């Protein structure tokens, strides 16, 4: 009987189980191991307690995050290994598509639940998410992310599912609650907010919370949720996000939203593993072309200085910061520009203070 090299099944909604020969385990371990760029600054690394590497495949248990299934399949293709999916009695197949979802159906639904007309790429994003049950959606600033989250929430509310929405700050909890109300929903009947000082126990179908408020809660608290949505997922601390998402072992539907995967606190593969394969909804330049964002013009003004030698880099910085002609040039440029002017400094204390005449500019100094 022909046997596949890898037999892949679901342990739960967090982990896949891979059954394979030991040598395949070690190849998988190599494939799914990466070094953290900032590891050398961490106490565990300095004390030689940890080698600075994150291992996403466990050779002892044969487990890997469900969201990395596409990458495991690609690994098999690259290494010419055969694989098969084995169905779990409780969790089904590792890869499932919701065939009941159609693009036209999503479009009609989004128009019916919202006072604002959804854009084509928003419909595409919601369709892709609902069809695949889990996704990491990359959605730039001003792309209308909250409308997409709202549409996903409304769909699962109608399916009588309990939904957990996790955001990084209390202001985002309030903002999302307000956005849902603005879209015309009776938000008070369905949603409950949790952050410092707010009650955690509730019968509400939808909970909007900061990750800081819930990551230490016991596993039992998370049992009732079948849907989890992480907004601004790149801002979550890796350990806390893993803690929350690992406790949601029965949450079949997982959606992460992030503006970028560059410079994330949590590695891209960890985010994909916890939520699902990434899907880029639209790029910022496309938003500009379509007129959804103001067009951006960048003019680079290069000020040339006469040659000078400095002992240290800091001496050079101080010379530039304190250069009167340069500071006057910036001041006059800002005064000549029409409309609102924003002046950004890397060092507000040193950079923004010297020209006293800056203070009468109607501009904001932002660190």
Regions from the PLM with identified roles:
Residues 132-152:
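Walker A/P-loop
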Residues 164-166, 170-172, 333-356:
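Conserved strand-helix element at the start of the C-terminal RecA-like helicase core
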Residues 312-341:
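Conserved interdomain hinge at the start of the Helicase C-terminal
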């Amino acid at each position: 009987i022909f046997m596949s090299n890898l037999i892949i099944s679901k342990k739960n909604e967090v982990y896949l189980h891979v059954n394979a020969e030991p040598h395949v385990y070690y190849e998988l371990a190599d494939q799914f191991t990466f070094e953290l760029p900032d590891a050398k600054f961490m106490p565990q690394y300095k004390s030689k307690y940890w080698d600075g590497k994150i291992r996403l495949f466990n050779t002892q248990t044969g487990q890997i995050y469900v969201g990395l299934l596409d990458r495991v399949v690609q690994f098999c293709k690259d290494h010419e290994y055969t694989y098969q999916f084995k169905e779990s009695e409780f969790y089904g197949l590792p890869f499932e598509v919701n065939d009941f979802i159609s693009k036209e159906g999503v479009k009609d639904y989004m128009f019916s639940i919202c006072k604002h007309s959804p854009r084509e790429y928003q419909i595409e994003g919601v369709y892709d998410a609902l069809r695949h049950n889990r996704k990491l959606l990359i959605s730039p600033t001003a792309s209308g992310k909250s409308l997409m989250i709202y549409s996903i929430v409304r769909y699962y509310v109608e399916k009588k599912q309990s939904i957990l929405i996790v955001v990084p700050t209390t202001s985002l909890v309030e903002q999302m609650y307000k956005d849902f109300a603005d879209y015309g929903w009776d938000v008070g009947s369905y949603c409950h907010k949790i952050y410092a000082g707010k009650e955690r126990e509730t019968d509400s179908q939808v909970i909007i919370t900061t990750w800081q408020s819930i990551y230490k809660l016991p596993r039992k608290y998370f049992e009732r949720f079948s849907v989890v949505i992480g907004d601004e997922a790149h801002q979550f601390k890796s350990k806390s996000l893993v803690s929350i998402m690992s406790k949601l072992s029965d949450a079949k539907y997982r959606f992460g939203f992030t503006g970028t995967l560059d410079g994330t606190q949590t590695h891209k593969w960890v985010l994909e593993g916890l939520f699902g394969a990434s899907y880029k909804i639209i790029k910022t330049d496309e938003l500009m072309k379509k007129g959804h964002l103001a067009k951006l013009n960048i003019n680079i003004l290069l000020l040339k200085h006469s040659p000078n030698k400095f002992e240290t880099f800091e001496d050079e910085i101080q010379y530039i910061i304190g250069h009167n002609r340069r500071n006057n040039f910036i001041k006059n440029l800002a005064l000549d520009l029409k409309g609102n002017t924003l002046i950004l400094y890397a060092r507000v204390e040193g950079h923004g203070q010297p020209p006293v005449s800056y203070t009468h500019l109607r501009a904001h100094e932002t660190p």
